[in-house]
């Protein structure tokens, strides 16, 4: 015989869960809405990049990896900051310390290494599938410069979001990753455009 109390128990458990974890839902929802908005803006920027994509064939192979890499690197950076804030290793202030310096250095090293790796893979895929593409030199310059530019922008933004959310009683683990992913999407494409202009300037000499 079916126990008629089960639906009531489920509803009670769900309402209790939502009541006890309301802050998680609120923080996560706000962060995801910002992430969705950032992705929409990034899509608009990409739609305006057709001129550059025609001028630099093969660049479209590089872009998805560059966007994903930025979110992964700084999402991890934000997670490490959150952990260090929770256990008291660092304070939510823009003050350099050994732990913060190590995290910043690791982010720069990862960005440089993965940008170089991404450029080589993008060129390799273009050759493998017989796509028309720019030279490996151009791939490397665009990828590495875009990585450095994004790094300079994303580091203070990541620290600001982590520190501010922690100061205001929000759990950085709930808000930083989606928001950082949105900013990564948003700034990677303009960084690539700036890198293209720098490359065009270099090619004049």
Stretches found by the model and what they are:
Residues 2-144, 148, 169-170, 182, ...:
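Alpha-helical transmembrane segments and their membrane-interface boundaries
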Residues 60-62, 159-162, 174-175:
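Short hydrophobic "helix-edge" motifs at membrane interfaces and signal-peptide entry regions
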